[in-house]
Design a protein with these regions (language model features):
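Hydrophobic membrane-insertion alpha-helices, especially the h-region
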Residues: 9-23
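Cleft-lining beta-strand/loop regions that shape enzyme active-site pockets
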Residues: 22, 31-41, 51-65, 117-121, ...
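Bacterial N-terminal signal peptides that target proteins for export
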Residues: 2-9
Length: 445
């Protein structure tokens, strides 16, 4: 509330500077406690604004809008990496983004230690096919330094008309080497659910353990998972592995729908809490456990974020699934888009996600029940192995190395489910034997 009113007062003060005295009425009628604390700072802002206009060498080239826009960008940039002030042009681009009317490289990015960092490449996209990996740092875009570049500025420079080219310089922390990639932008269409072979066939092995990897949480994620589960159950699945590694997240409603496939209707899934009570919400399961309680493992790593963490945190809290891998990214905040009257907008962090036991996700991440770390070299090799279309481009030595790459986290998950299944089968048998023993004992008395 305070930040929103402060913005209103800022606009009112600017109106006074422009000779529109009516704005001061709103300022003086604002809540008294807010006014008393904000007014001295706004006076200072007004003084600096006029000093820049009067004394800066190129001050005459700057409009009040230029200066206020710059001030608002600076103000929002002090909050967190996910909040941002968007000028009208950028807000228009964001709207195109949500409507899917844009070309891109298919890489999800975050700001990490002031570097534009790849959170995850989306499969079957230009970035993925070129070999961009999670954790790569984008240090240049078309030859221009990306150091200390804002997240939205980077997004704006990376996307564009489908068919156009962009060159990015990527530093790979695991090797310390930088490499240029010339990529052609494309309309991004991604399959959300994939099988062990990066396809959509979902075969079931002799161990009867099903496997589905969710690439991200888009509009069709829940439907595609439903199709996969139907295929696996039709083959006699007895245990299930849900792979959320390197899944950067996506839509909240899809995370809720995914959780709903493994929980009874009405079970709490996630809640949001913010400074404003309007941002508080509670989401519950809207389906039923389609697997009937069969053993379930969720694989996660540091690049599992947002909606992935909601699913993992929920099913861990409710003891419906065991989590295996590495601690997740810790991106558990809600961004609201707040349009402003001149066509600009704020992207503002307004709430945080909480698991059913009220554990905060943001900054903390989800800690696995079974910690199975992988080295940078192992993750790098596994990521290359998953890019089967690029396998032939590797040297003979690299191809031989790829054949020996094992997914230790997936192997451990399979071992754990096998153990759970053996135990589940033995318990009824032991109970049956115990019952017979008691009956014999009774007959001999």
């Amino acid at each position: 509330m305070k930040r929103r009113i402060t913005y209103g007062l800022l606009v009112a003060l600017l109106a006074v500077n422009l000779g529109i005295g009516a704005g001061i009425f709103y300022f003086r009628s604002a809540q008294a406690a807010e006014k008393d604390s904000a007014y001295p700072s706004l006076q200072l802002f007004s003084t600096v604004l006029e000093m820049v206009r009067k004394d800066y060498v190129d001050g005459k080239k700057l409009t009040y809008k230029d200066l206020v826009y710059g001030a608002m960008k600076g103000m929002i940039n002090t909050l967190d990496p996910h909040s941002e002030f968007m000028e009208p042009e950028k807000y228009d681009e964001l709207q195109k983004d949500t409507q899917g009317a844009f070309g891109g490289l298919g890489i999800m990015i975050e700001l990490k230690d002031n570097y534009v960092t790849v959170l995850a490449p989306m499969e079957d996209t230009p970035g993925y096919k070129a070999g961009i990996l999670a954790g790569d740092r984008i240090i240049k875009i078309d030859g221009n330094s990306a150091e200390k570049m804002g997240l939205q500025d980077a997004v704006e420079k990376l996307r564009g008309e489908p068919g156009t080219d962009v060159t990015i310089t990527v530093l790979r922390p695991s090797t310390g080497q930088a490499q240029d990639y010339k990529l052609t932008r494309a309309i991004i269409k991604v399959d959300m659910a994939k099988d062990i072979n990066n396809k959509k066939e979902f075969p079931l092995g002799d161990d009867k353990i099903g496997y589905v990897r969710l690439v991200q949480f888009g509009e069709k994620t829940s439907d595609e998972l439903e199709t996969a589960l139907r295929k696996l159950k039709g083959q006699g699945m007895q245990g299930f592995i849900l792979d959320l590694r390197a899944n950067p997240g996506g839509l909240l409603d899809q995370a809720v729908d995914v959780c709903s496939k493994f929980l009874p209707r009405g079970t709490p899934i996630v809640s949001t809490e913010g400074q404003n009570s309007a941002q508080n919400s509670r989401h519950v399961a809207n389906g039923h456990d389609e697997l009937g309680g069969m053993p379930m493992i969720i694989l996660v790593n540091f690049n599992s974020a947002s909606a992935s963490e909601i699913v993992a945190g929920c099913l861990q809290d409710l003891k419906r699934a065991q989590i295996m891998g590495e601690r997740t990214f810790g991106k558990g905040s809600v961004q609201s888009i707040l349009p402003l009257e001149d066509g600009s907008a704020l992207r503002l962090t307004t709430a945080k996600y909480y698991t059913p036991s009220h554990k905060v996700i943001h900054g903390a991440g989800i800690t696995p029940d079974h910690l199975v770390p992988m080295s940078d070299d192992e993750e790098f090799a596994l990521a290359l192995k998953e890019r089967r279309p690029n396998f032939d481009t590797l040297s003979a030595t690299e191809q031989e190395e790829m054949k020996n790459v094992h997914d230790v986290q997936l192997d451990r998950a399979r071992d754990l489910i096998r153990g759970l299944l053996i135990y589940a089968h033995r318990v009824p048998e032991n109970e049956k034997i115990a019952g017979k023993t008691q009956k014999v004992a009774a007959n001999t008395q």
